[in-house]
């Protein structure tokens, strides 16, 4: 446990951002019956997976894999989640270079953010809270900022769905500059993670 905690602190010490580091930690420790966190898997991360779960202090029922939408699940994600997005009023938080016109679903509102958005665009959290939206589906494609958004927006307003979907839209948004293995039938596209 101590190793994982130290690893988190070491990772963010180089940015000298104690405030944002604390917000990231709060996002993994926040508890609510309708709030779920994604953790790394033991097959890819060994003991770090157990350390992360223990560090979060979450009930196991409120945990899933951080990569639940990718790897061997990506084709399922595209056939189910991606198709269902047209049934919602979508608010998308993604990189400012995103080509949202390529998406296979409509967006009601796009919030462009920069790289290191969890620091550079942190004020967006309060801006969204002030709008007091209802019945919206917020999709986060913004790195660690997605964790902060999901936590703080859910804590403030439980009348929406907040979903950190990571890199799943990158084939359409094309903001990352490279292709991930699971998009192109590579090794990870067949990778099946095991919980224990």
PLM feature segments, named:
Residues 84-127:
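Redox- and metal-dependent alpha/beta enzyme cores, enriched for Fe-S-associated oxidoreductases
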Residues 41-44, 96-99, 139-148, 169:
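Gly/Ser/Thr-rich loops at beta-strand to alpha-helix junctions
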Residues 89, 136-137:
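Structural motif
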Residues 41, 111-114, 166:
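Residues at the C-termini of beta-strands that transition into short coil/loop
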């Amino acid at each position: 446990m101590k190793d994982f905690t130290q690893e988190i602190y070491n990772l963010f010490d180089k940015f000298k951002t104690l405030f944002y580091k604390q917000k990231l930690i709060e996002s993994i420790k926040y508890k609510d019956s309708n709030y779920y966190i994604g953790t790394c898997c033991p097959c890819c991360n060994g003991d770090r997976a157990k350390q992360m779960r223990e560090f979060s202090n979450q009930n196991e029922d409120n945990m899933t894999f951080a990569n639940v939408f990718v790897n061997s699940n990506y084709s399922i994600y595209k056939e189910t989640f991606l198709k269902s997005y047209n049934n919602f009023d979508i608010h998308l938080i993604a990189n400012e270079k995103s080509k949202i016109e390529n998406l296979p679903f409509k967006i009601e509102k796009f919030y462009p953010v920069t790289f290191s958005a969890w620091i550079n665009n942190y004020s967006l959290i309060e801006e969204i809270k002030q709008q007091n939206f209802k019945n919206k589906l917020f999709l986060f494609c913004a790195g660690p900022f997605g964790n902060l958004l999901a936590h703080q927006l859910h804590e403030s307003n439980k009348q929406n769905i907040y979903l950190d979907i990571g890199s799943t839209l990158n084939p359409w948004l094309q903001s990352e500059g490279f292709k991930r293995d699971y998009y192109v039938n590579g090794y990870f596209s067949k990778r099946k993670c095991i919980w224990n």
